[in-house]
Amino acid sequence: MPVTDRSIPSLLKEQADQRPNETAFTFLDYDLDPNGFAETLTWSQVYARACVVADELTMYGVPGDRVAILAPQGLEYIVAFLGALQAGFIGVPLSTPQYGVHDERVSAVLRDSQPVAILTTSAVVGDVTKYASSQDGQPAPSVIEVDLLDLDTPRPQQALPQPASGSAYLQYTSGSTRTPAGVIVSHENVIANVTQSLYGYFGGPDKFPADTTVVSWLPLFHDMGLILGICAPLVTGCTAVLLSPMSFLRRPARWMQLLASHPKCFSAAPNFAFELAVRRTTDEDLAGLDLGDVLGIVSGSERIHVATIKRFTERFAPFNLSPAAVRPSYGLAEATLYVAAPEPGTTPRTVRFDYESLTAGHARPCRADGSVGTELISYGSPDPSAVRIVNPETMIENPSGTVGEIWAHGEHVAMGYWQKPEQSDRTFNARIVNPAPGTPEGPWLRTGDLGVMSNGELFIMGRIKDLVIVDGRNHYPDDIEATIQEITGGRVAAIAVPDNITEQLVAIIELKRRGASAEEAMVKLRSVKREITSAISKSHSLRVADVVLVPPGSIPITTSGKIRRAACVERYRSDGFNRLDVTV
């Protein structure tokens, strides 16, 4: 069946017909049992329950209406999401409000998407109902507790309705809570992107082992968690073993144990998770276990630190983890998820580039004589018709070695932003001026990320809007943060704070206060500040205007763990950080 004729509901029906009694999803609940209480659904059960939810939803709206999912990580979340799509509605995956604190992001998304219903569970309905209010004169969304529906009693089968637009769900990007942007992801986008990733990670769908197990603790409302944990199993028919993000954070060794105890595992995580796994997994945790069967672990969603990959592979090498297991990957919600990754079976590769040249916008590899430079990780050689480096001002392709904006093209590129036509046109409908032979003129997705092609390989610098421009030179905050993290190990935000003449570099650094006394702690803080200032000067030829040491948890982040640099600047300028070094 051609990709354009398929949908997520049709894929679910296919899996239920072809492998009705095979396990589709297993959720391990570590709150019920420290060893993980397993709840499992077969493909036929998932389909039947999704149909029940779909039938229920038909009483509240029509295909094309939005339905928000605000439920805890678990099987009910999966059934709710698939049920919404089964009814032809547009899903809006969201996180559950936590601990009774008002979640402005949830409120903003509900205002923007105006769902006719909210799917939740009885465990959190009290918190969720507070958000089910009337918006802009529209009726308040109905709140449906999925676990209280009679999910195991089949309802009359109905023809699968589809929204006229082909929209599957709105993936709200992690950015400002005041102006959320919902990426409109179609059924075609999802299927095309999963298929594209199968080529990127395995060499093609036909080379994807049928007995693969997806292992994921990533939140299902996040693009990487949604595609890996729900959509990839739908496309491939593989089994997914899931746990909650909190279960991972409380005990990172659980992730490694699951990777070692299931056949042919494939997983994904942001950079910080690899660090946690290294620091908080003991040899005893993996006693008698073997990681030699792990097919791959995608590293994505945030800046990938070369040192982290090295530490991770070295730490778990005694348990037979392949040096090629970690798969550095580049992607974004506007492209559904996946954009580029190195060739299957290759170990992560890095190249050192001359820092001075990079600040001038040119990638010049350092000589092989130990020259100090900026070490960047390769994201492989993407299809030239799908990825281009473009001058964001002139819209002309950049030659190899020249830094520019990464543009993406293909069936995986999403449809636009929900109810934001002008922003959608600027971002999703770009045109290359005088394209080279073989390069599509458009439409191209402007990613907002800076990258460069060098010797046919893609390297990434960071977000255009996050550039630190000092004395007319471009500095990449990700590089500066990597330098600092090698010293401190915690979360770091390198930000540009404007003064009357230029921008000044300020480093916000999370650090645990250590010392037998207040005086000893201050001595250690002074030492850390001196070491950081020296390292940045040496590695980046850059003076730090201020080094701000703060307690862990102080730096504003998005729901996916990315640093909110604009919020950091605002908080810094208003003296909003609780500084550990105020007397230093």
From Swiss-Prot:
It comes from Mycobacterium marinum (strain ATCC BAA-535 / M). One of its GO terms (biological process) is Actinobacterium-type cell wall biogenesis. GO terms for cellular component: plasma membrane. Disruption phenotype: Deletion of the gene produces selective loss of phthiocerol dimycocerosates (PDIMs). It catalyses: holo-[(phenol)carboxyphthiodiolenone synthase] + a long-chain fatty acid + ATP = a long-chain fatty acyl-[(phenol)carboxyphthiodiolenone synthase] + AMP + diphosphate; eicosanoate + holo-[(phenol)carboxyphthiodiolenone synthase] + ATP = icosanoyl-[(phenol)carboxyphthiodiolenone synthase] + AMP + diphosphate; holo-[(phenol)carboxyphthiodiolenone synthase] + docosanoate + ATP = docosanoyl-[(phenol)carboxyphthiodiolenone synthase] + AMP + diphosphate. GO terms for molecular function: adenylyltransferase activity; ligase activity. Gene3D superfamilies: 3.30.300.30, N-terminal domain of ligase-like. The keyword Transmembrane helix does not apply. It comes from the Bacteria. Keywords: Fatty acid metabolism, Ligase, Lipid metabolism. Belongs to the ATP-dependent AMP-binding enzyme family. This is Long-chain-fatty-acid--AMP ligase FadD26. Disulfide bonds: none annotated.
